[in-house]
Amino acid sequence: MKMRAVAVFTGMLTGVLSVAGLLSAGAYAAGGEGNMSASATETNARVFSLHLGATRVVYNPASSGETLTVINDQDYPMLVQSEVLSEDQKSPAPFVVTPPLFRLDGQQSSRLRIVRTGGEFPPDRESLQWICVKGIPPKEGDRWAEGKDGEKKADKVSLNVQLSVSSCIKLFVRPPAVKGRPDDVAGKVEWQRAGNRLKGVNPTPFYINLSTLTVGGKEVKEREYIAPFSSREYPLPAGHRVRFSGR
């Protein structure tokens, strides 16, 4: 699973206070009689991340869709935004996720439905897309983020640090002609020397994801997956034996 995080900083003093104005607010709080005391200043940090019910989704092009469970492990609500991206994670893939945006309360779960909307995929091998799910924090004034009583605390100087996390898992489009499982064919990967590089050749219709790749007792960190019927090179210290394990 891949994760991207974006930090959002907000501050509030009986409504709105910018981060840049925090120092002046602190000085105000420590000021003369009738002002807020320093003890009324608080810092809150919240992570808006979601737990996904699977590490990958296998999609049969002939099916009517697949589902993915999304869990909010936090004690506060957040918006859930989902999309499917192409293999390079830069452009939209021909899939739709429903609902695309919704509120998920704390300690609750829901299901996403992924449906293909078009696109051409090779009939003899897997294709890789990415399902990305992001937890979105509220903006100042968002009513969906209010408490059960509909009120917000307005008597404290506060600095809110909100971390929005996007989690992406693999979506494998596996046509009916591709039989078996990747675990059954991982041992068929052929390893070759290519100068000071190690070349892995994948003769199978599956994406081979290397969970570990060890050379001379040292783990190779650059161990990206090997696409079907293709190859990938990895750095290789000379004169070492290779061990690997795949998904």
Swiss-Prot record:
Superkingdom as given in the UniProt entry: Bacteria
Places the protein is found: Periplasm
Cystines in this chain: none
InterPro entries from the UniProt entry: Ig-like_fold, PapD-like_sf, Periplasmic_pilus_chap, Pili_assmbl_chap_C_dom_sf, Pili_assmbl_chaperone_bac, Pili_assmbl_chaperone_C, Pili_assmbl_chaperone_CS, Pili_assmbl_chaperone_N
Annotated signal sequence range: 1-29
Keyword terms, alphabetized: Chaperone, Immunoglobulin domain, Periplasm, Plasmid, Signal
SUPFAM superfamilies (UniProt xref): PapD-like, Periplasmic chaperone C-domain
Gene Ontology BP, a term: cell wall organization
Listed GO CC annotations: outer membrane-bounded periplasmic space
Coiled coil feature spans: none
Family: Belongs to the periplasmic pilus chaperone family.
Function text: Involved in the biogenesis of the AFA-III afimbrial adhesin.
Name of the protein in question: Chaperone protein AfaB
Organism: Escherichia coli
Gene that specifies this protein: afaB
